[in-house]
Amino acid sequence: MAQLKLEDLLKSGAHFGHLTRRWCPKMKPYIFMEKNGIHIIDLKKTVSLADDALNAVGAIASTGKEILFVGTKKQAKAIVAEQAERAGMPYVAERWLGGMLTNFSTIRQSIRRLNSIERMEIDGTFDMITKKERLMLMREKEKLVRVLGGISKMTRLPAAIFLIDVKKEHIAVREAYSLGIPIFAIVDTNCDPEFIDYVIPANDDAIRSIELITSSVADAIIDATAVQKDDEDAAATNLASEAQDEKSEA
């Protein structure tokens, strides 16, 4: 089972919060101490809360549902894309478009447009249009891929979202909360944890901290889906065996 270790969190700098003057008082329960004007996060609580979060993520993934990864800040975008793809999950790593969740039907239209252009490339349509038309379509595709590429295979709303930096991704938080979609998040000392269902208190600016926690979430999903597949394979084998037994008895 995926698990975060205190030593690894310490090495990644996950305990370093923000300047004390920039803190959110609601993060007080997760703060260990103040040192040189910086809040230090209580990593024992991080480990405990991360365990709860990873178990919950695994439970969702084991049902075959999707968890949307969100992280558009410079330090997070490459990690979010890599780990979400590794786990076979959708992601937003460039820009959160208002309505991505609350107006998903409209977003789906843009995704269908992207898929349509990609089919045109494959089926030979590009060979039958002018160079100018082809260039316009390619520019449109590049724009759509940049913003929607990570969710191009998402056909319905996610069962949950996992995000880095609650403050930066406040629109995503607001949309998920309004729809009752569970929110998992790395929450730093300058962020408001009020609307987050599963708070993972940690440094959301350090690349190593982001990578460690995000990869653990991906691991939890991969482990859970592997167990699900094993269970399905075992069930299929049992059904086949029972059918063979009935045939033999007949």
From Swiss-Prot:
It comes from the Bacteria. Keywords: Ribonucleoprotein, Ribosomal protein. Signal peptide: none annotated. One of its GO terms (biological process) is translation. Pfam families: Ribosomal_S2. The keyword Acyltransferase does not apply. GO terms for cellular component: cytosolic small ribosomal subunit. Gene3D superfamilies: Glucose-6-phosphate isomerase like protein, domain 1, Helix hairpin bin. One of its GO terms (molecular function) is structural constituent of ribosome. The keyword Protein biosynthesis does not apply. Belongs to the universal ribosomal protein uS2 family. This is Small ribosomal subunit protein uS2.
